[in-house]
């Protein structure tokens, strides 16, 4: 038994915490834990753009990104991100017919 991946977040529970909530503000925490502990991490914190998420993973700052607000705003975010990045993915059959309408 062990840990497969660590979801790194500063929590955001204190209104007066000295951390500014700007796009990617939690990434340095994930990057530091990944480097020092040698364990895969996920990055969170106002990650909203496909290229931003791709850069985080491809540069080794984190092994994955977790999205909340972006997925609430657009439940098909992953499909749109794949298209933006030129990655061909299989769409769920339920969505496939709607893909060509836009």
Feature-to-residue mapping (PLM):
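Flavin-dependent oxidoreductase catalytic cores
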Residues: 1-102
